[in-house]
Amino acid sequence: MTKRNLSLLFSSALILLGLGAYLFSAQTAVAQASPLYAQCQGCHQPTGAGVPGVFPPLAGHVPEILEAKGGREFLIQTLLYGLQGQITVKGTKYQGVMPAYAQLKDEEIAGLLNHISTQWGNKFPAGQKAFTAEEVKAQRAKTMTAAQVLEARNKLGLK
């Protein structure tokens, strides 16, 4: 084998290793978020469809939230501090309480938000990237009540 062929073989192997590591890390992040979603699916269902009039859907609604100014922050705040009060999603009213999940690590909350943002046909709006632990940490530095999170949601202009 010539030096050139050996060099090409070595370069190809490095590229494949790098690609494999990237794909593995992406799959690992989704796999780690999926067990966390088990805590959510009792209300929001495995399909993200929720229960009409009782628990709001995540499928089709999370992208609407992400498109609103302040939507990313609101989603993080909802997981950290919970949500209490009446909301309307796609014309259906919901009156209830979503518990806070502040006990989760910043990385877990980011992973869970990335999971619900990319499942059931949901996609990040153009130009938005995946949630990061740093974003969660910034929102964790604030102290909010579930009622204040509701106020933040009301400012998003969602229907």
Where would I find each of the regions flagged by the language model?
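Post-cleavage N-terminal segment of exported redox proteins
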Residues: 1-31, 118-119, 125, 142-159
